[in-house]
Amino acid sequence: MTQAPVTVTVTGAAGQIGYALLFRIASGQLIGPDTPVRLRLLEIPQAVKAAEGTAMELDDCAFPLLQGIEVTDDARTAFDGTNVALLVGARPRTKGMERGDLLEANGGIFKPQGEAINAGAADDVRVLVVGNPANTNALIAQAHAPDVPAERFTAMTRLDHNRALTQLAQKLGVSVNDIKKLTIWGNHSATQYPDLFHAEVNGKVAAEQVDQAWLADTFIPTVAKRGAAIIEARGASSAASAANAAIDHIHTWVNGTPEGDWTSAAVVSDGSYGVPEGLISSFPVVARDGRYEIVQGLEIDEFSRQRIDASVNELSEERDAVRKLGLL
């Protein structure tokens, strides 16, 4: 175990996702079983005590890879020298809240965090935004970190990807391991588009193994509205599954995608597939040499085009709204 430790910052660390995430990071699941980790837990002042309680529990696990924990309410301290930043803490939408108010409230969180990452994060920093609206929160943070390469800012659609894998596997009576090349396009919202036209199940096109009515009327809405269904059933939003997807996203980013497969992540668009340059949108991606790259050359049929465009239009509207608020 001669590897240098990786510093991982988790915001909203005292929340449910943070609680589900931190023990898995400390056990070595984020990067790998040979990489020591140092944890930084960032919280708002009134939640610092709760985060300190979580830190006590982490200590009590005696994880061999865990080389230290720091709890703070100061963003500059939290992101100083950090290699991986998991931005989980966000302002949730409350009843009757307009989208503009939600974007403004989150701007107040993600602008200073972007500035703090810009000021002090390690040169190899990787940022994953989990807190919703994740794509646009990532855009705000990235806009305020001009010295960090834009490609280092990502938002999480791996939870949607994993949800889609399981829905398809259950429909066809196969293992999730039998499914390759599934894609989530667009926004992490109800407009997202889970694409089966390029996905393969045991080497055959997935969309050809299900009927069109199931795909359009059951599969797509089930994946898109799964978060709401979990709130309805559990009385609280997805926490362990979101934490699991965050682990998957970073682990893949660092260690690579399997040969002959890809995954989904919201990354800064380079104009591929008609997505305006600079938007943070979900694409099919491969991870190579520690970088996410958009899979090129896929043919997009009319069914898919309409759905991708609808989600991308929503992202453009969100970007315009935060621009008007002076957050970009």
Curated annotation (Swiss-Prot):
GO molecular function, one term: L-malate dehydrogenase (NAD+) activity
Database matches in InterPro entries: L-lactate/malate_DH (IPR001557), Lactate/malate_DH_C (IPR022383), Lactate/malate_DH_N (IPR001236), Lactate_DH/Glyco_Ohase_4_C (IPR015955), Malate_DH_AS (IPR001252), Malate_DH_type2 (IPR010945), NAD(P)-bd_dom_sf (IPR036291)
Name of the molecule in the record: Malate dehydrogenase
Database matches in SUPFAM superfamilies: LDH C-terminal domain-like (SSF56327), NAD(P)-binding Rossmann-fold domains (SSF51735)
Domain of life: Bacteria
Active-site residues (renumbered): H188
A Pfam entry, by short name: Ldh_1_N
Residues given in the record as substrate binding sites: R93, R99, N132, R163
Key words, A-Z: NAD, Oxidoreductase, Tricarboxylic acid cycle
HAMAP family: Malate_dehydrog_2
PROSITE patterns in UniProt: MDH
Record: residues binding NAD(+): G12, A13, A14, G15, Q16, I17, G18, N106, Q113, V130, G131, N132
GO biological process: malate metabolic process; tricarboxylic acid cycle
Family that this chain belongs to: Belongs to the LDH/MDH superfamily. MDH type 2 family.
Catalytic activity: (S)-malate + NAD(+) = oxaloacetate + NADH + H(+)
Function per UniProt: Catalyzes the reversible oxidation of malate to oxaloacetate.
EC number: 1.1.1.37
